[in-house]
């Protein structure tokens, strides 16, 4: 395989993994532990 092909596959997998992790953190089970700074400082 060429170096560019390996790099593009690696970069694509990395991007998909980070997107999946961020979606899981935002909407998954861990989202109940996130704090909302706007809700804490209501005036």
UniProtKB/Swiss-Prot annotation:
It holds the Pfam family PsbN. Belongs to the PsbN family. Coiled coil: none annotated. Signal peptide: none annotated. May play a role in photosystem I and II biogenesis. It is found in: Plastid, Chloroplast thylakoid membrane. It is a single-pass membrane protein. GO terms for biological process: photosynthesis. Keywords: Chloroplast, Membrane, Plastid, Thylakoid, Transmembrane, Transmembrane helix. This is Protein PsbN.
